[in-house]
Amino acid sequence: MAKITKTFQYGKHTVTLETGEVARQASGAVIVKMDDTVLLVTVVAAKTAREGQDFFPLTVDYQEKFYAGGRIPGSFFKREGRATEKETLISRLIDRPIRPLFPEDYKNEVQIIAMVMSLDPEIDGDIPAMIGASAALSLAGIPFKGPIGAAKVGYNDGQYILNPTVSELKKSQLELVVAGTANAVLMVESEAALLSEEVMLGAVIFGHREMQKVIQVIDSLTAEACTQPSDWVPPAKNDALVIALKKVIGGRLSDAFHIRDKLQRRDAIAAVKDDVIQQLAGRLEVEGWNLAELLKEFGELEYRTMRDALLDTKVRIDGRSLEAVRPITVKVGVLPRVHGSGLFTRGETQAIVVTTLGTARDGQVIDAVTGEYKENFLFHYNFPPYSVGECGRFGVPKRREIGHGRLARRGVLAVMPSLDEFPYTIRVVSEITESNGSSSMASVCGSSLALMDAGVPVKAPVAGIAMGLVKEGERFVVLSDILGDEDHLGDMDFKVAGTSEGVSALQMDIKIEGITEEIMRQALQQAKVGRLHILGEMDKALAAPRAELSDYAPRLLTIKIHPDKIRDVIGKGGSTIQAITKETGTQIDIQDDGTIVIASVNNAAAREAKRRIEQITSDVEPGRIYEGKVAKIMDFGAFVTILPGKDGLVHVSQISSERVERVGDKLKEGDVVRVKVLEVDKQGRIRLSIKAVEEEVASI
């Protein structure tokens, strides 16, 4: 295939799509250029599915090459290693809108690799990667119901900004990524500075409208490349098997979905499934059916049973109305030795969230393509297998845990104090101890409580809620505070976090087309009502940050010195600063601008360290009397240390009003004496006098 190039203007940026020259053995390959940011995105699809494959094996890997920013990796091996948190999050961002566009029965392995090969510091790789993945999939000749478009939306001074630069985002009240097809929004990911629901919805609609040009260009590229349509044919539906299943099941699935307890409901459905397999086992070989086919159709009947009951009765699995939030219990200060903690329980979803305060040096140093930077607010989400009553892998966080942690972090970020206002590194850890839907939003609620319990001066409490949707034709219901089954069997997972004043984070994943603006508006308004209810329940336990930090949290004292005096505080080979930290038991961080932060659980120790630093950095004042220690005896006088690192000379003539023949007759090393500063010359040399002090005392 000859090289094909398409170029278009996208916001302030020029975007170019190229195919046919690089990675020609891949099923589909596109080079995407957005100004100076360049990515190679490839797709490879297996010709057939593996034997017994019962899920769609789609893998997405996004990687930023360090050479893209003109840097060599800082790791020991000097090469790219395991995916960073940012790479994992962007991989998920690519995956989420494209996964629903593959047929349910398609089980061939598909791998997408997006490599950032040149990076303009002002243009991130996320939107080009999503555009490239959409184009490469469209060129791959596989059953993909795309293409999709993607856009980033900012908001400032009442105006939406299409694909803002990194600099513009720093001033923006909103960072929202939206992806979708020509007719439908499929995915939204955002963080916001407590904006209204109307502004958030407007951003989604604005982004979807603007991305249409991306979809049109990809369609044009695919047409010019003469991409052959997929010859994959879905397996025919086995009507005889479905009839047999329905007959054996009867009303038992419907009865199981009336059981309110999650584990009991799961066991009841499993019992029905086991009985069905046992009853139909003898017919599988005779009828030419297979077990995988039977299980698939059983899952389809589960799906239909729950959805039909919900649409017909407007009553949910656990007996709630559509808008009702599950019962909430809230506790704070549940762990005695930590700096702040909260236990948040909503129905069968529960999180223990802990806040730890540290100094600036505890911040995480990120070695990124654009350079090193430090992160001083860390949020970690853990989802152990026991939280859903299962055995499983425990330890290294999976992609889902990283994604949920980032969403929860976005939820509280808008209310966090700046480093100047609260100079601590803050780590929040959410331990999910039970899960039946919406654990990331439980983490938002729990983190708000733990932060306030730790005394972090957040601007307002934050709560989060997950919304769902079930839609069949023109009939639909919007669900507040969804269960795990409602998420799994529904058409939308719509998470909203915020305060009583506005939205701080929004994440939306939609599995179907036909979600209208009106449905999204209803979901946002219903979410607001639920969020305000949850905030009211949280306020009963703790409505504002505690006035005092935990007894076990470090106290920070901040002082400012002239940058030229930093070397005096550090001392030769670090001797001075090491002595202060060792003798006072404090931790001291010195910044290049002269800011010194002293950390200690003991207030008195911190104050002593501060006093000693102030002594070292204070200027010697002529005419002032100091108490000093004789450091060295010379023939012509004695050197006396009046401040740390500051010695002055007491000439033999200034030791006493009487004649002194030998200095050693009057002074010895280690003697503590009172001296008056006579002069500090231009070279910083200090002249001292003991005699002047004696004369001054005598005159009084």
UniProtKB/Swiss-Prot annotation:
Localisation per UniProt entry: Cytoplasm
Positions of disulphide bridges: none
Every KH domain range: 554-613
Top EC group: transferase
Gene3D superfamilies: GHMP Kinase, N-terminal domain, K Homology domain, type 1, Nucleic acid-binding proteins
NCBIfam families tied to this protein: polynuc_phos (TIGR03591), PRK11824.1 (NF008805)
Family the entry assigns: Belongs to the polyribonucleotide nucleotidyltransferase family.
Name used for this protein in its record: Polyribonucleotide nucleotidyltransferase
Organism: Xylella fastidiosa (strain Temecula1 / ATCC 700964)
